[in-house]
Regions:
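Inter-helical turn/loop segments and adjacent helix faces that build the functional surface
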Residues: 59, 108, 160-171, 230-243, ...
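Long, well-ordered core segments of solenoidal/helical folds
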Residues: 7-26, 66-83, 115-134, 167-203, ...
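Acidic/His metal-coordination segments adjacent to aromatic residues that form catalytic metal sites
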Residues: 76-83, 134-139, 199-213, 268-278, ...
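Core register positions within helices of long alpha-helical scaffolds
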Residues: 51, 58, 100, 107, ...
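CBM-like carbohydrate-recognition segments
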Residues: 2-44, 63-65, 74-92, 96-98, ...
Length: 381
């Protein structure tokens, strides 16, 4: 396919997904589809609604805004409570969808969105923390920091503190990124480990460093986008902190680029083991890289020369994994369904573990980031 054909196909693909989805039954949430359980407020839908709202902002097409509002309104009540969401679960994943409430509040001015924003914020006020001050990823994972959690919570946290709390928590957010750099960055590769256990008690944690054993692509992707999204919401008056996160972002992109597959432009599921049996070129993390870089270049956080790396990743992913079925339906493959650390399934962070998780099509953890990258590609035209 030509680049123009790919962009057209992606537009059709998004329309196909929203035409076949609702808040009760989003076809892109494969975990929910497989479980057969009713849908809940969750980060996976949050990724897709963020992408739809970004499409609205870029194209002006009202159908994306209308779909997003209807989806969110299924959960958000007039008093600001959110159906199926419990702040006391202390799960950072559940904060992600909250970013979209700011957008809807700005557009529609409905106070229920403002109240729901405070509902989400109430979780972060009492979210358990490590001794150094980082949010625990979940209450059920004590003392643990995962890269995923930076994307799930920090952009919301930074936006709330900047808008409504006189920037009181902004330096706290910055310090959490610096703690992650101190503990989770590998000096040799520049990559960041998926998880860190401050207590050093988990079976997956290195007894000296507390880190998990490997560099999972999607976790790195979440982390890169988190830095871009936090910078976007951060006041430049915080001179040292703003430039500190920008420097961390630039260095991370430089380091990650070294692991980009030369032929396809994609990245491997476990980043530093290319071609190892069981490893594969993975869609979601590659798309997150493309989005982070394209957005970072557009907003001036990254040098323009990096955009070529992102475009190669974007088109490489589409060439390899985006296709049209004989019945006319569209499909995006190569998406790791899920990966975590600990829990009842003994997720030990090994190569074998990351290679064992299901690879699926049309899941929002891959679709959402690719559509976000697509909106950046449109903006470059």
């Amino acid at each position: 396919m030509t680049h123009e054909e790919i962009l057209t196909l992606l537009g059709d693909y998004v329309d196909y997904l929203i035409a076949n989805s609702s808040a009760e039954a989003p076809m892109w949430n494969i975990e929910k589809v497989r479980s057969g359980k009713p849908n809940k407020w969750n980060y996976i839908d949050g990724c897709m609604i963020t992408a739809c709202l970004s499409l609205y902002k870029t194209t002006g097409d009202e159908k994306y805004l209308s779909f997003s509002r209807d989806f969110i309104d299924f959960f958000v009540q007039e008093d600001g409570s959110i159906r199926t969401y419990d702040p006391k679960e202390y799960n950072l994943d559940n904060v992600n969808q909250g970013k979209n409430l700011f957008t809807l509040y700005d557009i529609f001015g409905d106070e229920k969105y403002r109240r729901a924003i405070d509902t989400i914020r109430s979780q972060l006020l009492t979210q358990p923390r490590t001794k150094e001050g980082n949010f625990w990823h979940k209450d059920i994972y004590p003392w643990q920091v995962w890269l995923d959690g930076t994307y799930m919570a920090q952009p919301f946290y930074m936006e709330y503190e900047t808008r409504y709390n006189k920037m009181q928590g902004c330096i706290d957010s910055y310090k959490q990124f610096m703690n992650i750099k101190k503990h989770m960055r590998d000096e040799k590769t520049g990559l960041y480990y998926h998880g860190y256990d401050e207590s050093r008690q988990m079976y997956w944690a290195d007894p000296v460093t507390g880190c998990s054993p490997n560099f999972w692509l999607r976790a790195m992707g979440w982390f890169m986008v988190a830095m871009v999204d936090v910078l976007e919401r951060m006041d430049e008056q915080l001179y040292n902190e703003y430039r500190g996160i920008m420097a961390q972002l630039r260095q991370t992109i430089e380091d990650v680029h070294k692991f980009q597959d030369e032929e396809t432009g994609m990245f491997w599921q476990v980043m530093d083991h290319p071609g190892v049996e069981g490893n594969y070129l993975e869609t979601s993390g590659t798309a997150l890289f493309a989005y982070a870089v394209l957005k970072g270049v557009r907003l001036g956080y990254l040098p323009k020369r990096m955009a070529a790396w992102a475009e190669k990743a974007f088109y490489g992913t589409c060439d390899r994994y985006l296709s049209k079925n004989p019945d006319g339906s569209l499909q995006l493959d190569g998406i790791c369904l899920v990966a975590g650390l600990g829990g009842k399934d003994h997720r030990d962070g090994s190569l074998a573990y990351y290679f064992s998780e299901p690879v699926v099509c049309n899941d929002a953890k891959g679709v959402g980031p690719l559509v976000l990258a697509y909106t950046e590609m449109i903006a470059r035209k």
